[in-house]
Amino acid sequence: VPMEAPSLLDLPTDRIQESDLADVLWRDPSGIDILLAPPRVEMAEMVTVRDLEKTLSLLRRVYEVVIVDTPAVVNDINLAFLDASDTILEVVTYDSTTIHSTMVMADAFRMIGYAPTKVRYLVNRVDSTGGFDPEVLVRALGRVPEHSVSSGGQLVVRTNNEGIPFVLADASAQDVRDRHARVG
């Protein structure tokens, strides 16, 4: 992502229109439009829940699918996104800290009143259990995770460092073929 790429802060949130999106979205090499978070952490305080709700509403009108990547904390901003979501996809790995955090979030989601069908789980690096019994995760979630992806090994690390989506870097790689098979 170029350092000078526009971000959410560049939107005229008081009067946002569809035409404003073209000025603030960054298109990645795969053709996905991305609305970036503010470039510095302290600038995030300038964004209000109302700004995000208006922006998300507009994005949902323009795009068939809107993915919001939030940090693993519960605050007013993230709750606004979670409440507005059709589906929450929580990414988990086979390590005790992540599993504990996932259990805490699952309890929070239940207390908030989210239907179990709203929350889905994706096990990242499913082939790298690190000696962890996968059944522990199933017990912690109270169900089998709906999705999983393998680690991707060196291809993922190399292309991430190069800023290239790994699915575009080597179409013949097994991990890429696996992912294409999952999405059809």
Language model regions located:
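NTP-binding/hydrolysis catalytic cores, primarily Walker-type P-loop NTPases
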Residues: 161-184
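Phosphate-binding/switch loop-helix module in NTP-utilizing enzymes
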Residues: 37-78
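Phosphate-binding loop that captures ATP/GTP phosphates
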Residues: 1-34, 45
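Conserved C-terminal guanine-recognition region of P-loop GTPase G domains, centered on the G4
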Residues: 102-118
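G-domain G4 guanine-recognition motif of GTPases
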Residues: 92-93, 119-131, 148-154
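Inter-motif core of Ras-like GTPase G domains
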Residues: 58-61, 74-96
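Beta-strand-loop-alpha "switch" segments that mediate conformational coupling across diverse proteins
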Residues: 125, 138-167
